[in-house]
Structures are given as C-alpha cells and as structure tokens.
Amino acid sequence: MAEYSKLYITNNGQALMAKMIAGSGNIDFTKVCSSSTQYTESQLQALTALSNIKQTTLVSKVTRTNEVAIKIDAAYSNVDLKEGYYMRTLGLYAVDPDKGEILYAVCIEKSNNCYMPPYNGVTVSAAYLQLYTTVGNADNVSLAVSPGAYATVGDIQALEKEIADLKAFVGYSDGDIYGVEVDFENKKFTRLAGAVNRSAGSGFDGINAFGGRKRCNLTNDGRVAAYYGEAGFSTTGKLTQAVDRNPVGTESPDENLKFSAGTIVQVMVEQPKFYYKVVPLKTEKRTKGAITRKIRYYVSDTPKAGFKLHPAFIVNGQENDVAYLAAFEGSLWDASASAYILDDSQVADFAADMLCSIANAKPLSGLTQNATRGNIRKLAEKRGTGWEQGVVQTASASQMLMLIEYATFNMQSVIGNGAVSKTDDGKTSMTENTGATITLGNASGSVVNANGIQIVSYRGEENFWGNIWWWIDGINHYANATTGECETYVADHGFADDIKAAPYEDTGMTAKYGNGYISAFCYSEDFDWLFLPGEFNGNTALPVGDYCWNQNGTGWRVAVLGAGWNGGLGAGAFYWGLANASSARSRFVGGRLVYRKKVAA
C-alpha cells in the first residue's frame, strides 16, 4: 500500500498564498503530476519543477474542508501508459497571476511500493488521489475544474449509489437479482426482476442462494465430511465409513480432507452467502422506526450496488462464505455415557453435554430439565468454536429466501401445515422424531408419518415450524406493557440474556406488545433484514398468516420461533413467541444448532 508524506507547500506556493491573503487574487489549482524521481522531504520546499514526470492529470474536484484548507481530488489511469514506473513524487500545480503556472505543493511516496503498470490491452489500472493543503483563506480558491478531468472514484461511487437507489425504487430488471414486492395493505405479492415467471422449487434450483443449500455432515471443528447423496453421508451422528475428499490420484493428499469411520458429525444445511436489499416503498412511523405497508425484498448471489451481505454471514466483523444450519431439531449428546440421547430423557448436564442435529431422535425439550435459552446456548457452544444455537440472523436468512421463492409469508399454504395438529395432553413432550424428511434430501416439501402427522422441510431444514418451538439467540427484547412497545436489541456474537450493552445494538424499532396475527413487520434501515412483528390485524392466511405471542407484562424477554405440535394455522416460518422470560423452560421448547466461523470477541 502506498504511503505518502505530508504535502509540502513550495516557496512559490507560499508566495502565491501571500498574494491571495493580500487580496491580489484567487488560487486556481490546475493539475497534478507524478514523477519517478525520489526526492527527500528536505528538498521539497525549494522545488520549482519536477524531473522525470511520467503522468499528468487534471484536477477533478476542489472541496473546501474548513476556512483555511481544501481537498484536491485527482485520478490517474494507465490506458495511455507505454512503460510502467514507480510513483515516487506527486506535485500539485496552481496559477500565479504574475508567474503563470507554478509548482504549489509536493509530497513523496515513502514505501516504494506504488507502481503504475503499463497498459497491456486488457487490465486497466488506476490511482485515486486526495491531497489536502492549506491556502490561508479557502474562500479565495477557485472551485471550478476542467471538464476534461477524470471523474474520481468518489464521484463514481456516489453516482452508482444514486442509480442503485433509483433502480430500487423503480424496480430492478436484472436477471440475476430476485425479488418480491409485498403490499401489506392490499395483501398482494408480486414477483420482481429475475424472479418473474419463476416457480418455487425447480425455478430457483439454479440460483446458488437457494439451490446451493445442501445437507452435509459437519465435524466439530467445522469441516464438511460428506454431502447428501455421497456414499459416506450419514444421519446417525457418526460416519459409518471412512471418507477421503481428496481427488482420486492426488500425490500429496490433504489430511484434513480425510475422515475415519466413527467420526462425530452433525447433519447440517450448508447455506451459501448472498446479498440483499430491502426497499421500503411505504412505511408508517412509530415512536422508534416504522412498520411496513409496502416493501420490496431482493437477493443476489453476487455483490450489487446498494446491496449488503446478509448478516447471517457476518460474525463480529468477519465475513464468511457459508453458514451451516441444523437439518433437524436439536437432541442431546450425553458426555457421561458418550452416547446420543434418542428419547428426550431429561438427563442434560448443561456444563458437559452437547446439542446435536441427527435423525431418528426425539427433540430435546424442557419437560423437567432446565432447558432455558441460556442453557441450550451452553450445550451448543460446548461443541466447539463457531457453534451456537439458532440465531436471529440465520433464521432471518431462511425466512427471506422462503419469502422470495414462494412470494408469500404463509409457508403453511405452499409447503405444508407441518406437525401442528395434535391435541396437547397437558403433560408430555409430544414431538415426532427427527429425520422423517431424509428422503427429500435438499428439496422442499413434506412427508406424512405413519401416524398421519405431517413433517415439513425447506431446502434441507426440517421442521423450521411445527413439532417444537426453538430458542432464537442474538435477540433480546424489553417489553413495556404500559406503552405497548417493546425495545429490541440484536448481537451477532457474545450472546447473553437480559442485556442491551455491547455487543448488542439497538435495532431502532419497537415490536408490538400483545398477541395476534401479524399484519406488518417493523422496519429500520440498519436492521431491514429482521422480520419483527409490528402490528396484529391479520388473519390465518394474509398478509402473513402467522401468529405472535408478545404479552407477559413488563420486563426482559427472549424469543422462540416456529410453533409446537399444537400450533395449528397460527404456526409458520414467521410465528414468533416473544413473551418468555430468560428463566423459562418448557416441554414445548427446544433448540437447533448453527455453525458459523468467527473471530474472538
């Protein structure tokens, strides 16, 4: 990276500044020249010209930064450059009313790493410069620049943002952007851009954010041992055969790609990263933030102007290419017995045991054991660095993809009601065992167990709704029964209950206190990815079709998602429970695993 000295005003530059202060005229900056000569800082003030000038560019922009200082923007390109050179010295030129064009100020490059290559007919290289200098009185500086000057990177970025904002409002037409417009008031959903004329399922299989989701076996240290459909793939929690992921014939095989039979693995869904944009066309203001009336959601596999990387792929500032979501509801690994608990025996040691994601297990619950959100967090984190229970960021990623793929919030109407139709017995955990959708593989859909209970899956995630609620981490919620508003705080690491201090951030919006069918979500620009219930005037079908519980007095609350075995038509991918204290445990609530690589807090 280039490292430049401060900008030294030459003797001629100081003389011009004195004339300006005396009222003899303005300063008109004209050009910036780059030289391959290596001067010393002690030489700069006396210079009247530069030797070995290799390139000259016009000044692109002059900006007053305060009463006595300005910023000069300029840019170089190598399009006309026949020979490469090191940019060792930069000179700023101005017009003196008596002497003509003078060398006003000079700086030198100190690292000797700033090389401008010649143009090879293929790759264009460029340098963007910002020079700051004093002028005595910034009001006496000409801000006009030559129309032949380069547009700077800053200008281009600003223009790109304006164009992106305009396109977002008018509507994207790009084939590799996929979106949906939701008109909450008129209960209408419209496919946008590349999603137009696509059908859910096969119509989205070729899009990496959707079709790139695939079940896999993940080791405790975050290595993929096998993918669904491969010979070594297992749903039992252990590899049943040795796996070597090195290409056949590799001369120097990577030992990290070799896995022995018996290796502990979890069944996860690999979710490729994607970028998103939310465009609020109509919102209704609240005390904090707003609620949605008409809004557009877009995703893309690749970065686009105005799009952001979805927070599911960001942990404490570190960006990840993938996230791993539990294929199945969490069960228990009993460390003392070195065995998976398959019947929800209430034997959890929250200091030693681990949360799991395997097939043919009855999901862990808080029937009698103290399976609070905080304790399920311990079970998840015990598996190793990067492991957590389900977090709001990854839950939101799946919610956003479902919404865009199906052009509805009501997943029960397009995938299936799920395991939500049982009559509760008032005393037991009535969950179905995990793994009923093994045969669906990476596809969405539903199967029916022998007892008539339907099990659903969204692209590898079984029972995202129904069967048992699951704790959602990374979101803390302070309910105010008096004002009817609930402040919400979110973090992507360093999880704890009942706090709003760092790393938690105020979302700038308040969830609706009370119970009912969701008719609008909350909105704030910084947390536009979050589907937080903001109004309860809906029904079992539209505009969302899912219920929300958020009424349990004033105080800190934690979140659950999805519904249990008796959730009925109120259940779904957007069915939130926001009424539990952090001390709560329930036979209706369990947990799910998530794996995201992360840096230390």
Q: What label would you give each PLM region?
A:
Residues 1-147:
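N-terminal assembly/attachment segments of tailed bacteriophage virion structural proteins
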Residues 81, 86-155, 274, 278-280, ...:
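Beta-strand-rich solenoidal segments
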Residues 151-169:
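A signal for long, low-complexity, Ser/Thr/Asn-enriched, surface-exposed stalk/shaft
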Residues 168-270, 276-278, 387:
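GGW-centered surface loops in extracellular recognition modules
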Residues 393-396, 420-433, 439-440, 448, ...:
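C-terminal, surface-exposed recognition/capping segments
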Residues 478-492:
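A short, polar/charged loop-to-alpha-helix boundary motif
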